[in-house]
Amino acid sequence: MNICMRNGYEQFSLTSPGTSDLEIGGSFWKDEPDTKYLCLDSPVEQRQHQPPMAVCAGCRLEISDRYFLRVNPNLEFHAQCLKCVQCSRPLDENQTAFVKNGQTYCRDDYRRLFTTRCSRCHGDFDKTDLVMRAGPQNVFHLNCFACVACEKRLQTGEEFQIKNNSLYCRSDCRGLDNPDTSASVPDYSKLNNNNNNDNNNSSSNFDEDEWDEERSTLTSLDNNTSSPLGSPKSDGVRTPLFGHHNSGSGGSTSSCGKKKKDKQATRVRTVLNENQLKILRDCYSINSRPDATLKERLVEMTGLSARVIRVWFQNKRCKDKKRQIQITENRLNSEREEVLNRVRVNGIGPLMVQPATPHIDNTLGGPIDIQHFAQWNGTPPPPPPQYGNPMMFNSPSTFDVSVILAPVAPNVTSPSEALGPLGASVFPHFSPQHAPFTATSHDISSPAPCGE
């Protein structure tokens, strides 16, 4: 019987064990009716026939065991890897598991870590319990939904407030020591009537040179009427004369600094009577920035100089601007403080008691059954193939005759014709002239007695 091996392309004639020679065929593919072909699958083909191995979600290794445990459609574990991440309690198909963020928990740890508890007694809720809700996060038992001060049970429709996670009824919340916010709220009536209070005085002191200190923020509208201090244009204004300041140009920096110190030491004030103040305020209410024509009329009506009128309007605009900024800041601060006080006392405003509802926590998942699966049926899969040299046999007795294929037809002259459609893929470029035939008669011998 002739046997053809893949990857070697040799053909041998096997004789009985009693003979001492192994005849090598004269031609490579002889038409002999007893010729058999041995076809072994390649390692790549063996790998393709194997089913994909499952990966354990606990140890991240392939599951080579015959049986494995499955939790959820995409979580598979070794039997020894499925356990609670908190208490390391083993889980099997006789129990239920809970999954949160890809981690498995037992029932006790899952309820302890993730279930909603009463905001007052910190107890658990049963599925049949009715609960009272105070906002999105505070949940109470029916008996726990009461004022902590008077222990009054709150009914549907009553108002309540929450402070420091404690529940208060409306009457007890009013008695709490709330921060006083009245000081931060400005008195708009006083701010708006500051100008009217000056009418009660028979005279008013006006600082003529006050605007010089704020010259960087506002600009003068009447540059033609501006004149240095001590000029003869300031009619009706008591202005002391300083000889060393008025004589010369006074251009040096040291002289300017000395002049400013002297001016701060002796400030000139103009006294305005009630009639003059009334005329200026009435004009300011109509037009806060009078032009040159209007200023000339004011000079005639009040008897004041143009410079005094210009400085009075500039000071008035600056004071009103500062007052408006202060009012806006006080209003924003009072609103912010009021919101913070409301949050510290009752969260977001006074709350209304709603009817009791069943306790349903949609954020928690239900229990998941653990299923026991077999990774393959019957015998286990073969071990991974070993890549290396072609298979060689030490003796003819090591062949498994059960894997030998069909006999060769008489007119077959090549392995591809002998194996049919499979032969073209197994021996795609086979040629008898280029066969790696190197065996000789003394390379392989028949079994012999131990004496040899």
From Swiss-Prot:
GO terms for cellular component: nucleus. Expressed in gonadal sheath cells, URA motoneurons, and 10 additional cells near the isthmus and terminal bulb of the pharynx. Expressed in the ALA and BDU cells. Residues 347-376 are annotated as: LIM interaction domain (LID). Transmembrane segments: none annotated. The keyword Ribonucleoprotein does not apply. PROSITE patterns: HOMEOBOX_1 (PS00027), HOMEOBOX_2 (PS50071), LIM_DOMAIN_1 (PS00478), LIM_DOMAIN_2 (PS50023). It is found in: Nucleus. Residues 192-205, 217-227 have a biased composition (Low complexity). CDD domains: homeodomain (cd00086), LIM1_Isl (cd09366). Residues 265-324 bind DNA. Pfam families: Homeodomain (PF00046), LIM (PF00412). Residues 184-268 are annotated as: Disordered. One of its GO terms (biological process) is gonad morphogenesis. Interacts (via LID domain) with ceh-14 (via LIM zinc-binding domains 1 and 2). Probable DNA-binding transcriptional activator. This is LIM/homeobox protein lim-7. The gene is lim-7.
